[in-house]
């Protein structure tokens, strides 16, 4: 099974965040936000068949957005913005996630430079990587094409 790493989008602040076991299936995502994306956590099944709980990366305050994917539901599109907030040069300010079941989830406030990753055909998001300190500085995705 091919795995593609796309991104990240955002700034260079914070520390690098990544997963150690390649992902096979994304189970759910939790995002905390306010004027920016404050934290992200997610659960996935690895290529080894084990379930992994990752994060939260960043801080946990703000409004919670919970995404629990159905057994055949997948993330088909992710978009958002990144830019200066809170005297920080470049952080992720907004995320919009669309699933194969046409569920749309939004977190944060659109502000800054836009990015969009619509996935073609059977492509779907199976995990995340990026940079974080007290907020999410940058975000990227793992995709099965």
Curated annotation (Swiss-Prot):
Residue spans of the Sequence repeats: 6-15, 54-64
Residue stretches making up the Jacalin-type lectin domain: 3-145
SUPFAM superfamilies in the record: Mannose-binding lectins
Gene3D superfamilies, alphabetized: Jacalin-like lectin domain
Keyword Manganese belongs to the record: no
Top-rank taxon, per record: Eukaryota
Expression sites by tissue: Sheaths and roots from mature plants and seedlings.
Induction of expression: In response to salt and related osmotic stresses.
Keyword line: Lectin, Repeat
GO molecular function: carbohydrate binding
Keyword Repeat: yes
Pfam families: Jacalin (PF01419)
InterPro entries recorded: Jacalin-like_lectin_dom, Jacalin-like_lectin_dom_plant, Jacalin-like_lectin_dom_sf
Region (2 X approximate repeats, Gly-rich): 6-64
The protein's name in its UniProt record: Salt stress-induced protein
Gene source species: Oryza sativa subsp. japonica
